[in-house]
A protein has these predicted regions:
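Conserved ATP-binding module of the ATP-grasp superfamily
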Residues: 104, 146-182, 243, 374, ...
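Glycine-rich phosphate-binding loop of ATP-grasp-fold ATP-dependent ligases
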Residues: 127-157, 185-189, 209-225
Length: 384
């Protein structure tokens, strides 16, 4: 059973849903979307009662956007999947649940009303301030000094007004303070099967331009990243799910690794990489992650990665520069020419997303500097 919502559904995912005939919840958004299907078949739209029956009969659930979680929690609140959603979306509750895996990890939950009066003098620095529920780096701040704290509190007030996500996605009433997690950051698309066993579908390394950078500009994957991390991540997720208890459940998980130490940043329930960027796996090694999960299949990475040694596959998020002039336009020809091999370019115009779009690229060892350049660029060099 598929739940679609704004802000974005890729043509790749939409075409898969049309061709496969998977049941999709009928909403004004999906009715509009059905008329834009790349294939000749429309979406298989089902009304609320039939959708609920399918879900309760054991059909696997998947959503492209966490904006759709409200319906699931409202109509299916007594199902095990709803319990897993609640646990994963509440970062403070998840920290408490997993605390025995890392008993020395510092974290503290604070009501928004108490942020300005909280004494932070004894907290280990750097630390991170973020909403207990959040998405798309909304309200996430790295604090190294008292001045950083002051600026973060000002930004919290501003973010609360400007956030375009519903309350269930970005809850600005409770905040989590936690020690800064050092090490390399990764994002993992996986599902837990009917026995609760983790099945990893893709592993991204999240690259940053600096210590204070919290943007989503660049995610990379490839043979080297997957082979180095697949065994240890699978073992770690097995320990985690012994506490969460998810079954037949997809998730997109962000974590950091320092040496042999793995620490979670956040769990995003019932979906894979946001804004349909999970499609990266199809471009990188021919794997449709959603189809693999819905059909309970397990990827054979030895086969999928054959012949791809030395290749890096990237998802580049083209976020708009701050204070962008209203008449500014992206020079797409110049942008695409900056990369060795663009697998797909997705340019979008969605008011609620401050993005030009996304690029999926393939890069060999001799051209990795192109990734360093785009990571640090504010994209003004590609405007006219």
């Amino acid at each position: 059973m598929i739940f679609l919502d704004r802000p974005y559904v890729s043509d790749f995912f939409l075409n898969y849903l049309c061709e496969s005939g998977r049941a999709v919840l009928r909403t004004p958004f999906t009715e509009e979307l059905s008329g834009t299907c790349p294939s000749e078949r429309p979406l298989n739209l089902v009304d609320d009662p039939d959708a609920e029956k399918l879900c309760r009969s054991g059909e696997r659930l998947y959503s492209n956007s966490e904006n759709a979680l409200d319906w699931i929690l409202r109509r299916l609140g007594n199902l095990p999947q709803a319990d897993a959603i609640r646990i994963m979306k509440d970062k403070a509750a998840l920290r408490r649940l997993l605390s025995e895996l890392d008993p020395d990890f510092f974290f503290q939950e604070i009501p928004a009303a108490e942020l300005s009066s909280t004494d932070i003098s004894s907290w280990p620095r750097p630390f991170v301030l973020k909403p207990a529920v959040g998405f798309f780096s909304v309200g996430v701040h790295t604090i190294q000094s008292d001045e950083d704290w002051k600026k973060a509190l000002e930004a919290v007030a501003r973010d609360a007004k400007q956030s375009g996500f519903p309350e269930s996605v970005v809850n600005q009433t409770r905040f989590l303070v936690e020690q800064y997690i050092r090490g390399e950051e990764y994002a993992v698309d996986l599902y837990f099967d009917e026995q609760g066993e983790p099945v990893i579908l893709n592993i991204f390394q999240h690259r940053f331009s600096s210590f204070s950078d919290v943007s989503d500009r660049l995610y990379i994957t490839g043979e080297k990243i997957i082979r180095a991390n697949l065994p240890r991540f699978t073992a770690w997720f097995r320990k985690v799910n012994a506490r969460i208890g998810a079954r037949n459940f997809p998730a997109h998980v962000e974590l950091r690794v320092e040496g042999d130490h793995i620490l979670p940043i956040e769990f995003n329930p019932l979906r894979f990489a946001g804004l349909c960027t999970t499609d990266m796996a199809a471009f990188a090694f021919g794997l449709n992650t959603v189809d693999t999960y819905l059909n309970g299949k397990k990827p054979d990475f030895d086969t999928l990665l054959a012949g791809r040694k030395g290749k890096t596959y990237s998802m580049i998020l083209l976020d708009k520069p701050k204070n962008l002039p209203p008449d500014a336009r992206l020079d797409t020809e110049k942008l695409l020419a900056a990369f060795q091999h663009v697998l797909e370019a997705r340019f979008i115009n969605i008011p609620e997303l401050p993005l030009f779009g996304f690029l999926f690229t393939e890069t060999d060892e001799d051209h990795k500097d192109e990734l360093d350049r785009i990571l640090k660029s504010d994209l003004t060099e590609f405007l006219f």
